Amino acid sequence: MNKWLCCALLVLLDIIEWTTQETLPPKYLHYDPETGHQLLCDKCAPGTYLKQHCTVRRKTLCVPCPDHSYTDSWHTSDECVYCSPVCKELQSVKQECNRTHNRVCECEEGRYLEIEFCLKHRSCPPGSGVVQAGTPERNTVCKKCPDGFFSGETSSKAPCIKHTNCSTFGLLLIQKGNATHDNVCSGNREATQKCGIDVTLCEEAFFRFAVPTKIIPNWLSVLVDSLPGTKVNAESVERIKRRHSSQEQTFQLLKLWKHQNRDQEMVKKIIQDIDLCESSVQRHLGHSNLTTEQLLALMESLPGKKISPEEIERTRKTCKSSEQLLKLLSLWRIKNGDQDTLKGLMYALKHLKTSHFPKTVTHSLRKTMRFLHSFTMYRLYQKLFLEMIGNQVQSVKISCL
């Protein structure tokens, strides 16, 4: 009989436990020695521990966990759990310990947890590409490149890339690609011309230099009237005013003026005079020889809309190695509504500090930005701007970026 009663009580307790979990706070059974009755008490919430069981006169007393300890679920324990003291080797803190959560650690970038160790992500060999990027919990997943795709580098991030369609660039296929090599297209002067950059870094710095420290009334109209050559029409000026902020309007106007007057002697002279700047930028950036993966990482670190892997690969096909980074920065600027490229690079460099990006490249980018902001370039911009517009607005105070 006693055995039967024990079984019945256990079943009853299970039923009570199941039904009470459906309500908050969940309940638990407690024998009250004062009355001799079983009471339904509230469990303690996450972040607290049980100080006193409930009675017929008062509810359960729960108090906050002390520092460096926690509880992460509804419970009836009279103590909290100590937080893990430190993260293991090659791990960093993902979430600090608090009263409701233990300290959460994860493997540093480029590694994943395998049992107790942070191992490096697998690198896919040439002929294979990444189909699932590695995470702090999972290794990289590689797969052989299917027909029509290739990967020519060892990488833990780069996917297989589609073979170049030579006809898209007006070229002939002279050697079919395979899993490790791209199609080889016939060389053609037209291909190098397609790398054209609408506004170089130096021209952009020069055009942005022309923005006054304080915008004066009708500044854009004054500038339109002062520029030599074919005038930018009123409709275009109004469109610039509608679409862009006052600080951005000067850059947009000068960019459009340059496009309309590219065959004018004045524009040719300005471009020739900026060659000093361009050659210095090439000295800093022209020998970077970045891989597809590195170009992708740099473009990903820029704010705003991103340059796609396909655009990066297309740039690598149509531009010389010394032009690829500059072309991609130009594409980023256009895609993001002519945002300031140098400000975008400053943002990117802050984020690249935490990644395994080549320090020689970040150093070159910083040197380039310092050069474009230098006093020597300020004097050159000032000289060119005053030559371009004559003496009509020399009184306007010009600020260098």
Swiss-Prot record:
GO biological process: apoptotic process; extracellular matrix organization; negative regulation of odontogenesis of dentin-containing tooth; negative regulation of osteoclast differentiation; negative regulation of tumor necrosis factor-mediated signaling pathway; signal transduction
Effect annotated for changing residue 161 to R: In strain: 129/Ola and NIH Swiss
Per-repeat ranges for TNFR-Cys: 24-62, 65-105, 107-142, 145-185
Cellular component, GO, one term: receptor complex
Tissue/organ expression: Highly expressed in liver, lung, stomach, intestines and calvaria. Highly expressed in decidua and placenta, and in embryo.
Keyword Repeat carried by entry: yes
UniProt entry keywords in alphabetical sequence: Apoptosis, Disulfide bond, Glycoprotein, Receptor, Repeat, Secreted, Signal
InterPro entries: DEATH-like_dom_sf, Death_dom, TNFR/NGFR_Cys_rich_reg, TNFR_11, TNFR_11B, TNFRSF_decoy_receptor
Position of the signal peptide: 1-21
Coiled coil (residue ranges): none
Annotated site, Involved in dimerization, chain positions: 400
Resulting phenotype, residue 296 to R: In strain: 129/Ola and NIH Swiss
Residues carrying a glycan: 98, 165, 178, 289
Induction, per UniProt: Up-regulated by TGF-beta and estrogens. Down-regulated by 1,25-dihdroxyvitamin D3 and parathyroid hormone.
Domain of life of the native organism: Eukaryota
Subcellular location(s) per record: Secreted
Pfam families membership: Death_TNFRSF11B, TNFR_c6
Main location: secreted
GO MF entries: heparan sulfate binding
Death domain ranges (all copies): 198-269, 283-365
Subunit structure: Homodimer. Interacts with TNFSF10 and TNFSF11.
Protein role: Acts as a decoy receptor for TNFSF11/RANKL and thereby neutralizes its function in osteoclastogenesis. Inhibits the activation of osteoclasts and promotes osteoclast apoptosis in vitro. Bone homeostasis seems to depend on the local ratio between TNFSF11 and TNFRSF11B. May also play a role in preventing arterial calcification. May act as decoy receptor for TNFSF10/TRAIL and protect against apoptosis. TNFSF10/TRAIL binding blocks the inhibition of osteoclastogenesis.
PANTHER family per the UniProt record, alphabetical: TUMOR NECROSIS FACTOR RECEPTOR SUPERFAMILY MEMBER (PTHR23097), TUMOR NECROSIS FACTOR RECEPTOR SUPERFAMILY MEMBER 11B (PTHR23097:SF90)
The name this protein goes by in its record: Tumor necrosis factor receptor superfamily member 11B
Source organism of this protein record: Mus musculus (Mouse)
